[in-house]
Amino acid sequence: MDGEVLANKSCCGAVVTAFSVIGIVFTILKFTSFASFVYKTFFAKGVKLSVYGAKKGYWAVVTGATDGIGKEYATQLAMSGFNVVLISRTQEKLDALAKELETVAKVKTRTIAIDYTKTTAETFEKLHQDLVGTPITVLINNVGQSHYMPTSFAETTVKEMDDIMHINCFGTLHTTKAVLSIMLRERQKNEKGPRCLILTMGSFAGLLPSPYLSTYAGSKAFLSNWSASLGEEVKKQGIDVWCFNSYLVVSAMSKVRRPTLTIPTPKKFVRAALSSIGLQRGGTNPYISQPYPSHAVMSWSLEQLLGSAKGFVVSQVAAMHLSIRKRALRKEARLQAQNQA
């Protein structure tokens, strides 16, 4: 009997010890994760743009370049010493921005007008031919479209659905395909030359289910996984790939006009983005980052702290989008009434 008691005590002691070790390891891992998050978000410095050939005659390609975040990428890259290929829909806007950058930043520019809702394989073959021979080291995949207003998938028009997928997915892949072959050729010619960068704009909608923006959310989730896959494929060839996710940014697409702690201006967001290349902020997924500090905090909190509560967050996102939809519908009704008066 005494032997059985001793055996039971020994077994219980082993179980307690095992759980204690597990608890200690879990605590250490959580603390390490938190410390890494704090360091990368608030203290670490990203890869310098000189690594990609800034001020050495190399070129950056920016899509969706004439408004909002895209315009800021083009402007800040030009001010950092890159010549810039500007791609957007409206030639008049392209010409105005090109003139501005040539005057202010003293760089070379090229403009290419592309309506990403109407592209074909021939569009991107022509783009590739137009860019062959240009020493491109940076591609910013910024062009994108969201829903006109939050709408259930059942009520989303076929045109809006197709445009979102055509621009965000088809357009981004084909633009990257056209530019990547040029980058690879440059790297093969000069392995000791600057590295190359492919940076694609993602969204929080791709991190977390976004009811009433379902098509847009799906397109951004696709870009996250595609970027991570591509990043692993080309890293040994001297090409860095990142998907930068943002929460809301003041822009025409977000329909937000005033900046807040969590909603930066395009200038602030892009400044944070270009200074945090190479830093995996706000999450654990490789090649994916939330470069703006408050966005990184939000993302890390969702990933590390909420766990099963993510379902509650999704329901709150749905409620927020429904509220936005109601306000948009009221505004439309008000404008319609004014026009009829």
Swiss-Prot record:
Keywords: Endoplasmic reticulum, Fatty acid biosynthesis, Fatty acid metabolism, Lipid biosynthesis, Lipid metabolism, Membrane, NADP, Oxidoreductase, Transmembrane, Transmembrane helix
Superkingdom as given in the UniProt entry: Eukaryota
CDD domains per the UniProt record, alphabetical: 17beta-HSD1_like_SDR_c
Membrane topology category: Single-pass membrane protein
Residues annotated as binding NADP(+): V61, D115, N142, K177, Y216, K220, V249, S251
Record-linked Pfam families: adh_short
Pathway: Lipid metabolism; fatty acid biosynthesis
SUPFAM superfamilies (UniProt xref): NAD(P)-binding Rossmann-fold domains
GO molecular function: ketoreductase activity; very-long-chain 3-oxoacyl-CoA reductase activity
Reaction catalysis annotation: a very-long-chain (3R)-3-hydroxyacyl-CoA + NADP(+) = a very-long-chain 3-oxoacyl-CoA + NADPH + H(+)
EC code: 1.1.1.330
Stored HAMAP family: 3_ketoreductase (MF_03107)
PANTHER family: HYDROXYSTEROID DEHYDROGENASE-LIKE PROTEIN 1, VERY-LONG-CHAIN 3-OXOOACYL-COA REDUCTASE
Protein name (Swiss-Prot/TrEMBL): Very-long-chain 3-oxoacyl-CoA reductase
Originating species: Schizosaccharomyces pombe (strain 972 / ATCC 24843)
